[in-house]
Amino acid sequence: MTTVRTRIAPSPTGDPHVGTAYIALFNYCFAKQHGGEFILRIEDTDQLRSTRESEQQIFDALRWLGIEWNEGPDVGGPHGPYRQSERGEIYARYAKQLVDAGHAFYCFCTAEELEQMRAEQMARGETPRYDGRALLLSDEEVQRRLAAGEPHVIRMKVPSEGICVVPDMLRGDVEIPWDRMDMQVLMKNDGLPTYFLANVVDDHLMGITHVLRGEEWLPSAPKLIKLYEYFGWEQPKLCYMPLLRNPDKSKLSKRKNPTSVTFYERMGFMPEAMLNYLGRMGWSMPDEREKFSLAEMVEHFDLSRISLGGPIFDIEKLSWLNGQWLRELPVEEFAARVQKWAFNSDYMMKIAPHVQGRVETFSQIAPLGGFFFEGALKLDAKLFESKKLSADQVRQVMQLILWKLESLRQWEKERITGCIQAVVEALELKLRDAMPLMFAAITGQASSVSVLDAMEILGPDLTRYRLRQALDLLGGVSKKENKEWEKLLANIA
């Protein structure tokens, strides 16, 4: 009997997302319910954005939740390497195989040519897509341009008409017209694969039998199916999971909800409760109970109990469930978890240097630095009153800083300062005009330890959460303001 093998393949390009944890949980439960194996693979072909720090955060977040893997970059296994950046020769070999078989072709089009092609198609009211012009090149010209070292990509051929039937374990057969598919790039001009080629090659070579992924990938499923057909490989069973939603039914995004697993750990949520809540996202136990452990979910896991309606990720409901778990802890374990969460030596050593020189007794630490141990702050709107800025300017400054911080890849004091400086300069203000607002939003006080040091210590998730909290207190941002300020943001270096 074939061993069930599932996987999660996140990209290490930012904070570990709750959506990644959600898909990982369901892949894990499906594999373990069938006595199978769960694999972690790192999709790090985006060399500009991928970092080992983000990769380690993925490891830490999944392990904090209690999700372990049988094979992966850090534990090894018989199907490695498990980082796509280390599998370049493998992808190149299979891409060449597709070209030789006539299923793919070399494309030498420049970015300017592709942009012109797109503009002309849109002007004609057509859906922008590659027009296949490289297919008209003779073999001799292709070889000449390759020999000359001309930059190129490899694209796959796709049918121009007909229907592709996608067998989905949740929806049954889904029909998608081929004329919606573009001639997908498989190998980029830097020699690295795109998601589509790497995904198919890796899943096949790693023996993946079932793929549970987000439903946002369903429209592009025909490309993957066609690649399996081109290679002559058996396709894994496919399951397209419903996407997590904000309370307003929009797709879960960090602009409306904290999306990082690290944020919920820092806020003091229990990993058991977090997993429990993610397990209830579109799935339910046979007896409909709300509170259950990972082991209980594995024992009763059945894909037929997944609902296709977009599950709502609601922090208030998560908090309620966390309270159920927390209150059932033995007092000794409760105390131990509190100490591990807030008063562990690593965290205290980050805070101590900034507090020690400002107090005369230990009892003064809490009033000065208590915000380091809080999640949501009790804010006073009076703290945001400015002699220099109008109420609208206050909100504008804070919103633009929040947006700039959302784009920050490396969370360091110098870079945080740079974001704030860029905003105030664009608005022709001084740094001293913005810093009182930062003190108020981040510490809940008019003054404290260096707010820039505090932001670095608190981390990106909690910092951005508190800025959003402050903006909500001040009335939020209207749709008109949002549109106008985003245009302004685009011009801020």
From Swiss-Prot:
- Record-linked InterPro entries: aa-tRNA-synth_I_cd-bd (IPR045462), aa-tRNA-synth_I_codon-bd_sub2 (IPR020751), aa-tRNA-synth_I_CS (IPR001412), aa_tRNA-synth_I_cd-bd_sf (IPR008925), Glu-tRNA-ligase_bac/mito (IPR004527), Glu/Gln-tRNA-synth (IPR000924), Glu/Gln-tRNA-synth_Ib_cat-dom (IPR020058), GluQ/Sye (IPR049940)
> The motif 'KMSKS' region: which residues?
251-255
| One Pfam family in the UniProt entry | Anticodon_2
Supply the SUPFAM superfamilies for this chain. An anticodon-binding domain of class I aminoacyl-tRNA synthetases (SSF48163), Nucleotidylyl transferase (SSF52374)
What general EC class does the enzyme of this chain belong to? ligase
Concerning its family, UniProt says: Belongs to the class-I aminoacyl-tRNA synthetase family. Glutamate--tRNA ligase type 1 subfamily.
Query: What is the name attached to this protein's record?
Result: Glutamate--tRNA ligase
Q: Which gene encodes it?
A: gltX
